Amino acid sequence: MLAAFDKVVITPPLDGTWPDAFIDLKTGVLDDIHARLLLIDAQGQGGALLVSLDVLNVGLPEMQRLESALCHVTGLPSEAVWIMVSHSHSAPIVGAIDDYTGLGPWWSAVCDRIISSVQTLGRRLQPV
């Protein structure tokens, strides 16, 4: 079995765009939030991609778009791509919340970073 791991910073800018911040954003960031990625290649027995996001929640349309892009990049079927969230109340909610979509540009950048990371994971697979 082969595997590769990456951790990508996804901390959003502190520019007041959060619709319902649970924290005082003016004090800065104590700890960045991340996307953690694990690519597994079972060498002929299939594979899987696990993505963990430090966010409160991800809306279904946003989740489906990310999953589709990851399936396209990896060649894995959707049942082999698992995306989960930490449900941190100190992190953004992704999706249309009360018709608020101000985090859209940040989420697009997060997806781009995740996809870029996954593209490099395939070249970094190591025996485990």
Regions found by a protein language model. Give the residues of each.
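Conserved beta-alpha junction segments in alpha/beta enzyme cores
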Residues: 1-84, 88-128
